[in-house]
């Protein structure tokens, strides 16, 4: 089940949507019920990724020598050089999988909040762990079959719709990104009531999306006297930085727990922040996460370093020891294999302001597949 197939059919084929949801629920339950398997899964996937890169990427053949096995993959990964956007741009096809053809159609753009965006080919293989980790988070928040999810993001709404006070559009599928996508671009004192009217009609169990947009909607609703009568199970903040105070405010307003999620388009890290604090736990199911100093050496607990990731999702361009550009305080590792980020320090630039002082969220302009 690769990304190309899902992008094409999840929006229009209800049978595919249903099967995908059931598939994700099955594996999410399996991992949640057996967390003792996470570290072994991570080791197996790391071994598979290194072996694949050795066989299919010219760039890695000179660095990965000899047989890659589960008993030596950790030693191998620590010996490899760090990868960054400049190396990728310079190497191009050498670092791409040899399965990527000249007429490859599925390409993605990375975020540019900590640097210039990167354009790379997308190729999934095996279990879609992105969906599994998303489902694990929703189930942690109490997800049940039939619960509605809506998102707040930077989608652009047609002029015709906005003239009729419609500031949302239908999503690709309810899970994981929302049945309806509410745009953060048009929120103001005049439009907020229409957002709330549609939210009440939709009756979501979960809201996910940009923290700043969700915060702004809450504040505008309070300022205009709108009564909050949604019955939410949880709010899921992603794509932007936010503070614990902002998370607490959203939780207090919606009267539900608020979780944070940290990741990248490179599909190499999926980290969860619980409601009570700012600590992130990086899933060993999704990838292998390090925090390194300027020399590429792993920092000690309590020290600051750059988040470096090796993903288990993206094979078109294997992101192995990839420098994210984000800084974090390293907090060690849980017994389940989760890398702990005590505090995430990256992503300072999430928005700009137009001449009228209106926030324009950068993420909506960057994260777009072709």
Where would I find each of the regions flagged by the language model?
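Short secondary-structure capping/turn micro-motifs that flank functional sites
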Residues: 69-70, 154-155, 215, 266-267
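Active-site glycine/GP-rich loop and adjacent strand/helix microenvironment
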Residues: 1-36, 44, 51, 174-370
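Nucleotide 5′-phosphate-binding alpha/beta core
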Residues: 1-109, 116-131, 135-148, 155, ...
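Mobile, glycine- and charge-enriched loop segments
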Residues: 120, 147-188
């Amino acid at each position: 089940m690769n990304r190309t197939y899902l992008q094409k059919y999840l929006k229009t084929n209800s049978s595919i949507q249903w099967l995908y949801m059931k598939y994700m629920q099955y594996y999410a339950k399996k991992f949640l019920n057996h967390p003792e398997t996470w570290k072994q899964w991570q080791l197996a996937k790391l071994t598979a990724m290194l072996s694949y890169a050795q066989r299919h990427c010219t760039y890695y053949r000179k660095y990965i020598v000899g047989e890659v096995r589960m008993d030596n993959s950790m030693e191998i990964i620590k010996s490899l050089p760090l990868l960054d956007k400049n190396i990728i741009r310079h190497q191009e096809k050498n670092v791409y999988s040899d399965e990527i053809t000249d007429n490859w159609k599925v390409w993605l753009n990375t975020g540019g909040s900590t640097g210039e965006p990167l354009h790379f080919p997308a190729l999934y293989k095996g279990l879609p762990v992105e969906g599994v980790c998303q489902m694990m988070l929703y189930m942690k928040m109490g997800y049940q079959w039939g619960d509605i999810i809506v998102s707040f993001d930077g989608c652009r709404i047609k002029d015709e719709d906005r003239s009729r006070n419609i500031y949302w559009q239908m999503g690709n599928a309810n899970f994981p990104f929302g049945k309806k996508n509410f745009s953060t671009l048009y929120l103001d004192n005049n439009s907020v009531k229409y957002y709330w009217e549609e939210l009440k009609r939709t009756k979501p169990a979960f809201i996910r999306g940009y923290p700043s947009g969700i915060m702004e909607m809450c504040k505008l609703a309070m300022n205009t006297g709108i009564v909050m009568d949604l019955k939410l199970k949880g709010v899921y903040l992603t794509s932007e930085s936010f503070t614990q105070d902002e998370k607490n405010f959203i939780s207090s307003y919606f009267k539900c727990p608020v979780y944070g999620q940290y990741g990248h388009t490179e599909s190499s890290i999926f980290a969860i922040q619980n409601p009570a604090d700012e600590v992130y736990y990086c899933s060993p199911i999704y990838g292998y996460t390090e925090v390194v100093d300027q020399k590429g050496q792993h920092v000690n607990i309590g020290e600051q370093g750059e988040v470096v990731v090796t993903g288990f999702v993206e094979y078109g361009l294997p992101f192995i020891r990839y420098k994210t550009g984000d800084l974090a305080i390293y907090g060690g590792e849980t017994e389940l294999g989760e890398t702990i980020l005590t505090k995430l320090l990256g992503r300072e630039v999430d928005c700009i302001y137009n001449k009228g002082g209106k926030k324009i969220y950068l993420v909506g302009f960057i994260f777009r597949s072709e």
